[in-house]
Regions:
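Substrate-binding clefts and substrate-entry loops adjacent to catalytic sites
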Residues: 36-48
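C-terminal active-site subregion of NodB/CE4 polysaccharide deacetylases
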Residues: 26, 30, 46-137
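Short histidine/acidic/glycine/proline-rich micro-motifs that form metal-
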Residues: 10-14, 44, 81
Length: 137
């Protein structure tokens, strides 16, 4: 089984307590964990001007692509906040999809840049997850 972690790149660069460093991220990546973008500094993208959004999306992707030798494909919007401008900028910066915090199963009907998801918490059991999947078609 694999997992994906979403990285706020400036936090990892600063080596904040309880935040993965890039050395730790590389070690985990070598074991099969994947890493995607959660911006540079975790702003409210819906309230940010287009220049700030562009910087957050582009710079985070560039850092992850370079440091992890990968093509970062997914932007995970901080606090699930985004706008039509955000989605367009994500696409223009080479992201293939965007994840929201809207609870539910992802559907192409929602568009690739506004995908729902089920939140998995440390307390989520297999039974909880199955029940959530059955109630959120």
């Amino acid at each position: 089984m694999t997992a994906t972690n979403n990285i706020i790149t400036s936090f990892s660069d600063e080596e904040r307590p309880s935040v993965l460093t890039f050395d730790q991220i590389k070690e985990m990546k070598a074991q099969g964990i994947t890493f995607e973008s959660h911006t540079v500094s975790h702003p409210d993208l819906a309230q940010s001007d287009s220049s700030r959004q562009e910087s957050e999306l582009a710079n985070s992707k560039q850092v992850l692509d370079k440091k992890l030798n990968q093509t970062t494909t997914t932007i995970v919007y901080p606090a699930g906040r985004y706008s039509d401008v955000t989605m367009e900028l994500a696409k223009n910066n080479g992201y293939k999809m965007g994840l929201t915090t809207n609870n539910g199963l992802a559907s192409l009907d929602d568009g690739l840049y506004s995908l729902n998801r089920l939140r998995i918490l440390p307390t989520t059991t297999a039974e909880n997850l199955l029940a959530e999947m059955q109630t959120n078609p």
